[in-house]
């Protein structure tokens, strides 16, 4: 009886193991955004009140200067190549310039007024791809 149960379990396990398709893409969370870096582009980012978000720059970059049009409604914490951001007030829109040891980044940042947690355009992580 024990062998029969073990046999059924193994058949079920093997069948399910082969049903996984390694060529199907993994689901991507829309709140993690990757932008193609272009020095002539302004990147638009929307943040949720009370949530921490991160802007990640290239691995060989370090933040040197951050300038905000209206700094009051934002909490910023730079750490090496990452900039941690938190919106403090709803419905605020301003610009931000980040200068690293390699590049200049221009942003238009906005704090969300919606209470919908599933808003697609909210950014939790912003990363950059650098074409050669």
Please place each PLM-identified region on the residue numbering.
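A general "mature secreted/periplasmic domain" signal
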Residues: 18-132
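Positively charged n-region of N-terminal signal peptides that target proteins for export
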Residues: 1-5
